[in-house]
Each structure stands twice: as structure tokens, then as C-alpha cells.
């Protein structure tokens, strides 16, 4: 479920495990100087996979809106930012199958960070790749996303 908070002017994405609320991530749409994205909960500890649970192809992206859009084609994992800690890579390497393709698709200004993250993923035995595009994943059409992912 996606919610709207009129008082906070945020689109709210709650994250549940069964019936328990683990965290939420909100996107600000107001005119003020609030942070664009804001969350509550242990966002860096959550693996909120969206899409097909097959895990053949997993795309790591910055935000939940991109993950929702990417999930039309693969399993997507929002990072709730751009950082992937070594501990998070370790945990991810125990969750997914070693033959899974792990694609890092961050915003265009994060290309060098994507390269570093891909190298760490490879150190943990994962088949990591990078997608570099001129737009955030959420800003692409579904046709464009399919072209990037089918290559």
C-alpha cells in the first residue's frame, strides 16, 4: 500500500514483514526545504525485494519508485540511497543464488560509486554488472527499461 500524508506532503511507502511495520520511506512533494526522501526505521538493514521472487536478475537501485518500475521485468532491491556497506554485501551474498545476475543501476551522477560497488559484489562471488543511463530508472519508459535489461 502507498499512502499520502496531507500534513507532511509526502507519499509514504510502508515496508512490512508479514503484519509488522518495519519502516517507511517517504517522498516529499511540498514547496518547502524538506529533504526529498525521508525514512523511518532501519532502512540499511532491510532487504525489501520487489517483483518476481526468482532472483535470476536482481537490480539494485536508489529508491523504491525506481524499484517498483523495474519490478515489471526483474527482482528489484531499493537501497534507500546510494551506499551499499560491506555488511550488506555479505548478507546479500547469502540470500541470492551465486548464478544470479546482480545489476547496479544508480542515478547517472553515481557512476563511479556504481563501479566501486560492483567490485565489492564481485569480491563476494556475485555476478555484478552496471547499467549507466542518462536518467534515473524511474524516469525511463518501460520500453527503455526493457532494452537496458535485455542486453
Over which residues does each language-model region extend?
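Short, surface-exposed acidic
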Residues: 1-2, 129
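Phosphate-handling DNA/RNA-contact segment within nucleic-acid enzymes
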Residues: 3-98
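TOPRIM fold recognition
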Residues: 55-58, 64-151
Amino acid at each position: 500500500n502507498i499512502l499520502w500524508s496531507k500534513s507532511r506532503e509526502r507519499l509514504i511507502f510502508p515496508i512490512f514483514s508479514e503484519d509488522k511495520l518495519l519502516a517507511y520511506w517517504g517522498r516529499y512533494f511540498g514547496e518547502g526545504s524538506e529533504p526529498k526522501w525521508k525514512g523511518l526505521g532501519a532502512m540499511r538493514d532491510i532487504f525489501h525485494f520487489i517483483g518476481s521472487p526468482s532472483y535470476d536478475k536482481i537490480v539494485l537501485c536508489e529508491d523504491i519508485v525506481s524499484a517498483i518500475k523495474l519490478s515489471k521485468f526483474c527482482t528489484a532491491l531499493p537501497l534507500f540511497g546510494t551506499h551499499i556497506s560491506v555488511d550488506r554485501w555479505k548478507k546479500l551474498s547469502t540470500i541470492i543464488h551465486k548464478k544470479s545476475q546482480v545489476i547496479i543501476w544508480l542515478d547517472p551522477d553515481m557512476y563511479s560509486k556504481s563501479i566501486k560497488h560492483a567490485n565489492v559484489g564481485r569480491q563476494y562471488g556475485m555476478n555484478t554488472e552496471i547499467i549507466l543511463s542518462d536518467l534515473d530508472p524511474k524516469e525511463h519508459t518501460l520500453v527503455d527499461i526493457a532494452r537496458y535489461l535485455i542486453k
